[in-house]
């Protein structure tokens, strides 16, 4: 089996010297999509290519663009702020290949200090989203009050099937992407990973958390810094788009 990696750089040139040397030896090819001026890496590994956009595109558009430029049986999307441990990709690919209906696999993601990040999730509910994205989270801390959403009662050291996985580092089966139409380019920012997991689920594909694979993620969590910002507005609009596209999710609460 072959693995192609797609990295989207939107002004992330400074982070690529950490990611690319760690990622490139683990995959067959890497495509870096530079989405705006100043996004190009200073140097490319031998198995990497650069695509430079004439105008900025949305994240999902860039992922689809990079995917079309690759040929691997599996497509790995990696955020510029991630750094995989040695053999992280092999661990993901080995597990995913052992399950014929595994369409998406995600690693154990950790903060730079080694603390586990809760990247495996259940699909959001209306009530849960309101708590997480409003001042209510100060009264009802999500990681304490929404254990089911974050699968906190599951062992972090054991594989578990999740509804969706945070889109920082995802291994995706190409046949699944082709079947469901890739990433939904209608999202401006945020929720693309939730939508991807939901459409994969509807098509009968599994989504797995694989802790044998470890990735460091220096996540800024921009959308959580302030209650009123352009990022929270983008997130709200994306959630509204998700509900419009999948109105049956409203029945979840």
PLM features per residue range, with description:
Residues 7, 12-25:
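Short, well-formed alpha-helical segments that are part of the catalytic scaffolds
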Residues 53-70:
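Glycine-rich, basic loop-to-helix element that forms the pyrophosphate-binding segment
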Residues 75:
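Short aromatic/hydrophobic "clamp" motif used to bind/position activated sugar donors
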Residues 124-162:
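Short, flexible, basic/aromatic active-site loop/helix in glycosyltransferases
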Residues 83-119:
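Conserved donor NDP-sugar-binding/catalytic core segment of glycosyltransferases
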């Amino acid at each position: 089996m072959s693995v192609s990696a797609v990295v989207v750089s939107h002004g992330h040139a400074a982070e690529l010297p950490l990611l690319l040397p760690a990622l490139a030896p683990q995959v067959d090819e890497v495509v870096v999509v530079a989405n705006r001026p100043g996004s190009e890496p200073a140097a490319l590994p031998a198995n990497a290519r650069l695509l430079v956009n004439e105008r900025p595109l949305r994240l999902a558009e860039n992922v689809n663009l990079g995917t079309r430029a690759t040929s691997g049986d599996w497509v790995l999307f990696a955020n510029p702020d991630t750094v995989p441990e040695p053999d992280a990709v092999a661990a993901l690919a080995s597990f995913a290949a052992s399950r014929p209906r595994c369409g998406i696999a995600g690693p154990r993601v950790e903060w730079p200090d080694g603390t586990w990040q809760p990247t495996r999730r259940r699909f959001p509910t209306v009530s849960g989203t309101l708590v997480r994205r409003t001042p209510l989270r100060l009264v009802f801390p999500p990681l304490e009050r929404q254990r089911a959403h974050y699968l906190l009662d599951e062992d972090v050291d054991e594989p578990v099937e999740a509804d969706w996985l945070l889109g920082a580092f995802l291994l995706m089966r190409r046949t699944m992407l082709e079947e469901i139409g890739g990433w939904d380019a209608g999202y401006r920012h945020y929720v693309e990973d939730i939508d991807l997991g939901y459409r994969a689920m509807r098509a009968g594909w599994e989504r797995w958390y694989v802790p044998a694979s470890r990735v460091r993620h220096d996540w800024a969590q921009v959308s959580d810094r302030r209650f009123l910002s352009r990022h929270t507005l983008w997130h709200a609009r994306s959630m509204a788009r998700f509900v419009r596209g999948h109105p049956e999710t409203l029945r979840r609460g």
